[in-house]
Amino acid sequence: MPFSNETEMSQCSNAKRRVNDPLTGPKNCSTSSTDSGVILNDNVAAFRPEKETKDRGTGEGQFQSKSEEKTESKRISVEHTVNITTENVGKTSSPAVSIRSTTISVVSIDDNAIDSSSIDSDSEAEAEDYTVQKLGHQVTYPPNSSHLRDLNQGLTVISRHVAPGEAAVPPPNPLEAGIVAKQILNGNLAVATPTSPAGGATQGIGSIALTNSTDVTFGDKHFYEGPVTIQQFLIDNRDKWKPGEGPAGGQDNPAFNGGPSTNGSAPGSKHEDPAQTPPICPFLPNTVGRKAVTVTVVFVTLTFLLGIVLATTTNLFGKTLNQSKIRDDDDYRQNIPINSTIDLDNIGGGLILRFVERQQWLAQPPQKEIPDLELPVGLVIALPTNSENCSTQAICVLRVRLLQTYDIESSQKCDIAYNFLIGGDGNVYVGRGWNKMGAHMNNINYDSQSLSFAYIGSFKTIQPSAKQLSVTRLLLERGVKLGKIAPSYRFTASSKLMPSVTDFKADALYASFANWTHWS
């Protein structure tokens, strides 16, 4: 029984047609096929027992089938050939497979059966119940049932491949996917993907032999009423359909991006994900609190380093000034800074022995070498300077400098005449010191055997301050302790040694030492 299948839907002028054989009566064989996710084709085969007939389809790439029937046993043999073609695609894409008429349904071969093609067309015969077989189970509905309209949601393309460099086809309007589509997308339904044979050779499904059978269907049989809609989906293992929240119980689309877009974005640009946006400086933290802490730590560190640099610079500058050479000319002495404790008084109130060294009161260097003193000495001489009194260190420094200038320039001495000077502020100003011979008596016999304690001021009628008397005791004890003064020393007045010298007159000063142990 030769017949011809329509290969393309667009080439079938009438998918449902009537075939009448005047010799054998209303015997027909109608076939329907399911597409492998690509195109639906309806095929019709006309049964003629004596001569071969050919379907009037005009489509390109028709499939031809041949069958033979023995009239003695009324056996029908149907052969159907399926051509599978592989389109040329890139190496990186999957092959696109187009399958035409993969199954054949034989509706009726009985002589008394109703012509199904007449039922499908505009005939006057009554149609029997519709049989719908879907995914392994069969459900029967009466004609014009409302369930048939609900089932006809159109064909769904479940496999789509786009070659690299090929323009993407815009998706159709979003529609509610059927139950089968959801199962396929969620991975609950396994879909067999047909593979193309090697070498492009055609394959057949074999031969079918029927004997004394009525209303036999091979494969799926589908009835479509209304327009056919093709939907495109991408199949993977992820759950594409998730139940939505709320009373409606709708479906959420996980690919939807509901974030606000930034004004001025380029057309077609995607919303930037803050978690995926690389930071400008990866080594820096992202939170505001950490940034504040980082800035604070950096600021404190820089401030600390700056303080160290300033302290080091100031210390070096101070040492340079202190180690500068003091010259004897007046122009240089005017520019010598006072960077010591020159403005500080004796905070001990005379109870602490405090020396003001030559460098601190800005003494001139000696004009020549001064002879050494034979130590320990047994004589300590007290005498006045016959200058104005002083009660602060600043004034006392001025008095000492003036005395040195007078002794060097007027008296033609090599240095200030006294070993030590005691001021009203309670400080001891170092003159020639412990080891050098003084010029206080202008007599070599006394000067070479004694130390001189000069009291700044005139004490003919004014007594020395309590600070001056207190530091005098401390100075004598320090000399004995250092081995500069003999333990059995004699403490006396210059006027007693040279009564004729009027400059040594200081009765109020000498009277202050009248009850001292070593005074004589």
From Swiss-Prot:
It is a single-pass type II membrane protein. The keyword Transmembrane applies. Residues 412-490 form the N-acetylmuramoyl-L-alanine amidase domain. Disruption phenotype: Larvae infected with Gram-negative bacteria fail to induce tracheal expression of the antimicrobial peptide gene Drs. Residues 48-58, 66-78 have a biased composition (Basic and acidic residues). Keywords: Disulfide bond, Glycoprotein, Immunity, Innate immunity, Membrane, Signal-anchor, Transmembrane, Transmembrane helix. GO terms for molecular function: lipopolysaccharide immune receptor activity; peptidoglycan binding; peptidoglycan immune receptor activity; zinc ion binding. The chain crosses the membrane at residues 292-312. Disulfide bonds join C390-C396. Activated by proteolytic cleavage in response to Gram-negative bacterial infection; cleavage may be mediated by endogenous proteases, such as the metalloprotease Mmp2 or elastase, or by bacterially expressed proteases such as the surface serine protease OmpT. Glycans are attached at N389, N515. One of its GO terms (biological process) is peptidoglycan recognition protein signaling pathway. The keyword Transmembrane applies. GO terms for cellular component: apicolateral plasma membrane; cytoplasmic vesicle; membrane; plasma membrane; presynapse. It is found in: Membrane. Proteolytically cleaved, probably by a metaloprotease such as Mmp2; proteolytic cleavage leads to activation of the imd/Relish signaling pathway. Major activator of the imd/Relish pathway and is likely to encode a pattern recognition molecule for the humoral immune response. Required for Relish processing and nuclear translocation following proteolytic cleavage. Involved in the response to lipopolysaccharide (LPS) and peptidoglycan of Gram-negative bacteria. The different isoforms probably display different recognition capabilities to various microbial patterns. Belongs to the N-acetylmuramoyl-L-alanine amidase 2 family. This is Peptidoglycan-recognition protein LC. The gene is PGRP-LC.
